[in-house]
Amino acid sequence: MQYHDAMALINRLDSRDPGFKTALSQLLAFEAEQDESIDQAAAGILADVRRRGDAALLEYTQRFDRLAVDDATALEIPQADWHAALDSLPAAQRQALEAAAARVRAYHERQRGETWTYTEADGTMLGQQITALDRVGLYVPGGKAAYPSSVLMNAIPAKVAGVPELIMVTPTPDGVRNPIVLAAAAIAGVDRAFAIGGAQAVGALAYGTATVPAVDKIVGPGNAYVAAAKRRVFGTVGIDMIAGPSEILVICDGKTPADWIAMDLFSQAEHDELAQSILLCPDAAFLAEVEAAIERLLPGMPRADILRVSLANRGALILVRDLEEACAIANDIAPEHLEISTEQPQRWTALIRHAGAIFMGRYSSEALGDYCAGPNHVLPTSRTARFSSPLGVYDFQKRSSLIQVSREGAQTLGRIAAELALGEGLQAHAASAQYRLDQP
């Protein structure tokens, strides 16, 4: 078995090998390094923004983004500018954004929770009321790696949920705004946008300043400082998740073109050097074909340097006994993205319990899910799909319990509650229930 062989393009594992479980665990091991200096820097910035508000925001924006303005109100990007950005997009790009947005909206509209109630025989009504969050902050990274798809995936579910005010923050280094991000904000229904970024933007959204209103939840990806700041403000506000590196796991029966599978592995490996791309297949000859395809296609990729490191350190081609075993291994890995590139993918999907998104069949490339299929691309990473879910409408809605007890119901429930309260030594609880009992 090759594992972290300095010469290997990608690791080769075999599930029959006695050391397989250990090798797989090593391959999967990813500890998000909590860099103490980053955490301390974020904490200092948050405290400063909380204390000094707009003044701190202006200073940090000048220091980190080289953007100097006299007044914090100048950091707001007017809606007219977003619409101008939208109008200036090439027609094909605008059409692609609008088509993706329509699909994302159609999918998320099916997730909307509804208030429900039921009434018991004695007239007592119980239920659950669904309400949207009042105000949400959306962080969008700036600079070269601007992802308009991220705007659509975070903003549209919030608006479908009924969030009345959605505030986008995005850094504009040297004052340069990304027109496609602003265009996406216009399409997705964002309400306000500010040219701020980093831990200072997270602080402004969490605590509020004279210019930037405080929000109830902060969503969206960011760099290590943004992640550290989101971790620290959690509890004051809600957050979506702290995302780890991208992951793809492909289960293939050996009948999909090898080049397709190689490129699917590349699609995640190109994100960064810590991204993880793994193929599970029971056909050794096909694994060799995919390895040959990787070797052939890699030199032509613009991000070949990142791909090489990612595939050599965290990628793997794994020979399994059969597709049942592949599904069992997939459940253990709990991947962010899972492709089931087989005949009758439904059969194997039924065996999957833990995955962020499941791409079924040979034509369902993971890239389609990233951009325009409709389901959300904000997915649990680092094995957290064992207990968490994709971002969705439900992340922007809350549930309140409804309890309307009838006079008759109070007689039955009052006696039960009083008995339990006295058992816990809570006399006022008991009395509160007993006062409502009809006197004999």
From Swiss-Prot:
NAD(+) binds at residues 139, 200, 223. PROSITE patterns: HISOL_DEHYDROGENASE. Substrate binds at residues 246, 268, 271, 337, 370, 424, 429. The keyword Disulfide bond does not apply. It catalyses: L-histidinol + 2 NAD(+) + H2O = L-histidine + 2 NADH + 3 H(+). Keywords: Amino-acid biosynthesis, Histidine biosynthesis, Metal-binding, NAD, Oxidoreductase, Zinc. One of its GO terms (molecular function) is histidinol dehydrogenase activity. It comes from the Bacteria. NCBIfam families: hisD. Binds 1 zinc ion per subunit. One of its GO terms (cellular component) is cytosol. The active site is at 336 (proton acceptor), 337 (proton acceptor). Pathway: Amino-acid biosynthesis; L-histidine biosynthesis; L-histidine from 5-phospho-alpha-D-ribose 1-diphosphate: step 9/9. This is Histidinol dehydrogenase. It comes from Bordetella parapertussis (strain 12822 / ATCC BAA-587 / NCTC 13253). Its cofactor is Zn(2+).
